[in-house]
UniProtKB/Swiss-Prot annotation:
GO molecular function annotation: adenyl-nucleotide exchange factor activity; protein homodimerization activity; protein-folding chaperone binding; unfolded protein binding
Compartments where located: Cytoplasm
Primary location group: cytoplasm
Protein name, as recorded: Protein GrpE
GO annotation terms (biological process): protein folding
Quaternary structure, from the entry: Homodimer.
Pfam families xrefs: GrpE (PF01025)
Function: Participates actively in the response to hyperosmotic and heat shock by preventing the aggregation of stress-denatured proteins, in association with DnaK and GrpE. It is the nucleotide exchange factor for DnaK and may function as a thermosensor. Unfolded proteins bind initially to DnaJ; upon interaction with the DnaJ-bound protein, DnaK hydrolyzes its bound ATP, resulting in the formation of a stable complex. GrpE releases ADP from DnaK; ATP binding to DnaK triggers the release of the substrate protein, thus completing the reaction cycle.
Alphabetic keyword roster: Chaperone, Cytoplasm, Stress response
Xref: SUPFAM superfamilies: Coiled-coil domain of nucleotide exchange factor GrpE (SSF58014), Head domain of nucleotide exchange factor GrpE (SSF51064)
Gene3D superfamilies hit by this protein: 3.90.20.20, Head domain of nucleotide exchange factor GrpE (2.30.22.10)
Domain of life: Bacteria
One Gene Ontology term, aspect cellular component: cytosol
Lineage: Bacteria, Pseudomonadati, Pseudomonadota, Gammaproteobacteria, Alteromonadales
Length: 200
């Protein structure tokens, strides 16, 4: 009998456990629903954050590219400034060189009275030309070369059977370049080629 008395007490206990399980199941379903809702919210927040990160990465890449472009432009500007800083000064020296050439052309190197002056002007001019060449100034002396309108300024054309057509036959004034940039074109006379037909 003692076994029978124990059995009735166990049945209500099992019923209570079933009730707790059912109650716990409903609570779990509720918790799972809330957890799923929270997971969806977090996934949306994560997607928004990832989109923002991609946007920021794009902005950073663009900013870095802009900084590189600015650096390149600044470096090019500095290089140009260094390369052509002497342009104005060199342009001021060109008439001095022209006058020295005229002085040499107008002086007879063989005449004893003017020989010393000729040598002095010649050495001074040579020294000045060497000095400006050190800073990138280059003489453009196109005698006998084909006419180039980018570097030469034609004063006129004359027939000359000894010089091919469209070639420089006389340099009236030399031109000058500074680091490849034309400071002043050479003033030249250009050959038309063969002589003038006088029998016509």
């Amino acid at each position: 009998m003692s076994n029978e008395s124990t059995n009735p007490q166990q049945e209500p206990l099992e019923q209570v456990q079933d009730t707790e399980v059912v109650t716990d199941e409903a609570a779990l379903v509720d918790e799972l629903t809330q957890a799923n809702f929270r997971i969806e919210e977090l996934e949306q927040a994560l997607a928004a954050a990832e989109a923002k990160v991609e946007e920021q990465k794009d902005s950073v890449v663009r900013a870095a590219a802009e900084v590189d472009n600015i650096r390149r432009r600044a470096a090019m500007d500095v290089e140009k400034a260094n390369k052509f800083a002497l342009e104005k000064f060199a342009n001021e020296l060109l008439p001095v060189l022209d006058n020295m050439e005229r002085a040499l052309a107008g002086t007879n190197a063989e005449d004893e009275a003017t020989k010393a002056m000729y040598e002095g002007v010649s050495l001074t001019m040579k020294t000045l030309v060497n000095a400006v060449e050190k800073f990138g100034v280059k003489v453009v002396d196109p005698m006998g070369q084909p006419f180039n309108p980018e570097q030469h300024q034609a004063i006129g054309m004359q027939p000359n059977p000894e010089v091919p057509a469209n070639h420089v036959m006389v340099v009236l004034q030399k031109g000058y370049e500074l680091n490849g940039r034309l400071l002043r074109p050479a003033m030249v006379m250009v050959s038309q080629g063969g002589g003038v037909d006088t029998q016509a």
